[in-house]
Amino acid sequence: MGTYLCPMRLAIVPRTRWGKIRMLALASILPLLFLLIWLFTVKMPGSAFSGALPPLTPEQELLRRRLEQHVRALAGEIGERSRATYPNVVRAAAYIDSVLRSLGYAVVSQEFSADGRTYRNVEATLAGSALVRNEVVLLGAHYDTAEDAPGADDNASGVAGVLELARVFARAPQARTVRFVFFANEEPPWFPTADMGSRHYAKAARARNDKIVAMLSIESIGYYDTEKGSQRYPFPLNLAYPDVGDFIGVVSNLKSRALLHRAIAAFRARATIPTHGAAAPAWVPGVWWSDHWSFWLEGYPAIMISDTAPYRYPFYHTPMDTPDKLDYGRTARVVDGLAHVVRGLAEAP
């Protein structure tokens, strides 16, 4: 018996020992792996604003009033801008066109057909002033809405932001060219199909070999909540971020991480509102849900600036998404910070 059992014990001991070694190695590697993921995905440059918000400056107060005026015109006077209310889609495009022309821009429309109707993307361009004028910084926002929703936050707030950024830069050429583009057909049933306005635009840009060095999708930037528990996230982002919805979010896919870092560093250097950023795989829910996705498909670096919409806003895609729900003071702080981002991105390298 003894001579039989000893070899069995000798065979078992090494296996047990190596199993323990493997477990110890795994236990040491996992924290390192989580640290690397945190450094690559969650850690952002600069210091986010914290504490009590300072009073708006006179310029920010004027910006606040203008933002509210645009949102009330689009989501109040015009209202729902979906396939079911096609005349309102046309009216919204005309409103955007009129504002841009009043700022001195030449407006270009990119028309396309979808579901037997004509839709258009509306574009204004601020030509660059240096040798890098062929390089483009593009600011985009969709002006349509979901059905049965007036779309104050989603996305009259984003349209208002881009219109006011166009005002800021109207007489201030940068080294790189800056484009302000307003997309049709971001919402269902168009998302995510070839009939999205941004898909038409991004594919045409690639066909022309446009050198878009940065695309910023301004998507739902008007709603904030300082109550604990007001903010949710998709997994695994819920493991790394706070549950108070008082911040503006900036997200990208992994390929656009360098642009994300540059943008959020510039934003934090100026803005008086908290920020959080994430460079996450495109499969994470919410990360790709807007027009920046169209530019990713064409190989362009693109990020989304958002209040996180359905992960915070209780009136998302409902008839209650009305102008009275938004915080125009905080929205003005966001747009003011974005102006600083654009200046940094559009300067000569």
Residue positions per predicted region:
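N-terminal Sec-pathway targeting helices
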Residues: A11-L33
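A non-catalytic alpha/beta surface segment that caps or lines the substrate-entry region
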Residues: A27, P58, Q69-S129, H276-A278
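N-terminal capping segment at the start of a domain
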Residues: F40-N88, L103, D144, P314-D321
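Extracytoplasmic/secreted proteins, especially bacterial periplasmic and envelope-associated proteins
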Residues: R66-Q69, A73, P87, R91-S102, ...
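Structural recognition of the beta-strand scaffold that forms the well-ordered cores
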Residues: E123, V137-G140, R179-F182, V213-I218, ...
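Proline/glycine-enriched tight loop/beta-turn segments at coil->beta junctions
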Residues: S129-V136
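Acidic/histidine-rich catalytic neighborhood of metal-dependent amide-processing enzymes
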Residues: A146-K255, V284-V287
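Active-site-adjacent substrate-binding region
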Residues: D225-P349
